Amino acid sequence: MQDLIRASLVIALLSGCTASPMLKYSLDVPAQTMSVLDAPEVQDGRARFREIFCSTLHEHPDRKRRGCDELLHRLRDEAPSAPQPGPPPAPDHRLRLVFVTGLFNDCASTVALPFETAVAHLRSLGYSAEILSVSGRSSSSYNAASIAEIVSQAPDGDQRLVLVGYSKGAVDILEFMVAYPDLAKRVSAVVSVAGAINGSPVADVAAPFYQRSLKDVSLPGCGPGDGGALASLARPARLNWLVTNRLPNARYFSLVSFTRPDTVSSPLRPFAAALAEIDPRNDGQLLFYDQVIPGATLLGYVNADHWAVAVPIEEKRPVLATLVTGHNWFPRDMLAEAIALYLSEQLAAEQDTR
């Protein structure tokens, strides 16, 4: 009888009959990813990226608002910072950084586009940078064609093309890399920022409703596309795609975002709470271990939610940021600069070893 009672208690616990999520928010864990069998090994670039990001932050006018160690999470297994950080890399102005937008971003383009202010900042530093606003309501295969068109127009020469994908934009880039292998050879590096690499449980729940009720509904600022955006982000779709598709040779880098539940933007809080039933280390759209490209170099864990890491609502629409979203401040321009500097160093080192 006692064994039956114990078994019933265990079943009740595992069935979700708890007052709060079983996992607690904590940084006392190592870096981790979830991927498919035989996936390429992820490399750890956190220590050097932290050095570069912290050095760029010294140039930010609001650097005292939050310290560098508060902006980048330090998980249990990250190597301690060196007493004397290495010298900052020399910027490689041959880089051409193309930032690919994510889910529904074109629908909100009048508010702000991902890395909109960062692109202007990078240009002021001498880099070539631009935003590719893909169809926010379309499937990743649909948007891969748009990326292919941009890449096909890239001039020959010593320019180094870097594709930076935010959220679903990262997935669109990966589909491009596989579907257009000849064009993919022109890409020097791929960077995911809060990339939906493994998909999201949020999409698993929302995709059927969207397909039934919203797929063909007109929305301001964006056409319906092929209607497959959320279906592309479902976890079965993404994980099965990773099983059947090997990424071509290129350098891959991933920057992950997550933050505490109380620092999530207000509209994202219901999603963050739902995801916390799986793991509280999420950004309001994605779990932290779902954001790393197989075989990528892990750059770090940004202490920001899914919008704050990339979308400059505070800069572009300060009233909206204050009254509606909240918690949107983040030095995105410095983050983009640190990415460019890190790539400058890494791609130069790769060239030297050839």
Language-model-detected regions and their locations in the chain:
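Active-site catalytic motif of lipid deacylating hydrolases and related acyltransferases
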Residues: 88-161
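Glycine-rich His-Gly loop
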Residues: 100-103, 167, 195, 257
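Sec-dependent signal peptide recognition
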Residues: 2-10
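Serine-dependent carboxylesterase/thioesterase catalytic core
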Residues: 145-244
